[in-house]
Amino acid sequence: MSLEETLRSLSLDYLNLLINGQAFSDVTFQVEGRLVHAHRCILAARSLFFRKFFCGPDPPSGLDPIGGGSSRQPTVRPGVIPVNSVGYEVFLLLLQFLYSGQVSIVPQKHEPRPNCGERGCWHTHCTSAVDLALDTLAAARYFGVEQLALLTQKQLVSMVEKASIDDVMKVLIASRKQEMPQLWTTCSHLVAKSGLPPEILAKHLSIDVVAKIEELRLKSSLARRSLMPLHHHHHHHHHHDFGDLEDQKIRRMRRALDSSDVELVKLMVMGEGLNLDEALALHYAVENCSREVVKALLELGAADVNYPAGPAGKTSLHVAAEMVSPEMVAVLLDHHADPTVRTVDGVTPLDILRTLTSDFLFKGAVPGLNHIEPNKLRLCLELVQSAALVLSREENNASNNNNNNNNASSSAAPVYPPMSEDHSSSSSGNNNNNNNSIGNLNLDSRLVYLNLGATQMGGDDDNRHNNSHREAMNRQGGHGCDPSMYHHSHDF
């Protein structure tokens, strides 16, 4: 037997002591109401924290050396030590490493996790995997297990390469707090490359961290320019000035949107050449402004309602779905937002709402979104589902029309004799009228489907559409919803 096999066998023997529970156990912890049996000698040998806790005159905080909690909470089982500093899952990972020297920080594949709504996720770099690694890192530092902290840091470095920018910023904050220079360097460069403006970064990071990110960007820009030929320096100097000017435009645009001054934004587009898509004007307005501002911005005709933003490639409809805002969802769909558009990870707005609904139904509340109103969530889901259904029907109709046209063009010579000029023109006029009426009917059906505040239209067909849609909304949401509700101003 080789040395490696001997060490592996020794590691498994110690791990079996932990797995077998009470076998030879001389200490019991209580974590989140669950008992964990362990062995003092192993814990004291592997962790300075437990050595001081079991043997030192002044035990560290985080565990109750008496057992059973405070005097106001009488001890039910003497000798049980409550753990109040970490969760059950993280505490088991910590003990697993102390016993065996090995641990897998990645959650089980396809296991339902609280912060991961994707079905069948492998949890390699999702938010749930990142959160578990961060909690393990904090526990390793707290209990003085430096080897586990280094192992977790290495795991996080590989995770953040594929993680979302939100999770990268989360790890960046933790790396600074835990004094992990390698992790800080990796995350800070990823955030600097993300292209997010300082105003957005300031919402997630402290001012001094944002300043360091901007310093990294400046150094990177200077380094790139130093590699350019000398005759290009003058050009890049103007390019840098142009970038500063664009940043100023974006700040002015956001101030104008905050004050509902869409006319100023229009002047900036026409007079200064402001690109609303690159400035993420629509995303900003959906997240921070009222429905009226978003509608006025869309009616300028200068913004692409399906423009993907950031590394994740989210459209404004993705943002509205995450906000669970029926008003924003409605006005975006009214201006032809695509309910089936996908992010880089393949997530559609419909997927977001279905995940939120599933979490709400099975867990009673959505983590981080406890303010969600069930009726708003149902209404958003109904709107996006209806829009996706209408879009699918329109695509099928268009496909059928193309097939019919191809079949007609490839057929033999006409069987019937040519009609007179008057009859032909009359028939042509009737066909045009029929086509127009069909187009209007499709448009009316779309408006009724999306419940976007269309005015009451004459005719029995339209009444039947409106009545059937209200009945569907009553069945789905439990309450009838007047389309006029979307014309109210809602500030965010």
UniProtKB/Swiss-Prot annotation:
ANK repeats lie at residues 248-277, 278-307, 312-341, 345-379. Pathway: Protein modification; protein ubiquitination. One of its GO terms (molecular function) is transcription cis-regulatory region binding. Residues 25-107 form the BTB domain. Disulfide bonds: none annotated. The BTB/POZ domain mediates the interaction with some component of ubiquitin ligase complexes. Belongs to the plant 'ANKYRIN-BTB/POZ' family. 'NOOT-BOP-COCH-like' (NBCL) subfamily. This is BTB/POZ domain and ankyrin repeat-containing protein NOOT2. It comes from Medicago truncatula (Barrel medic).
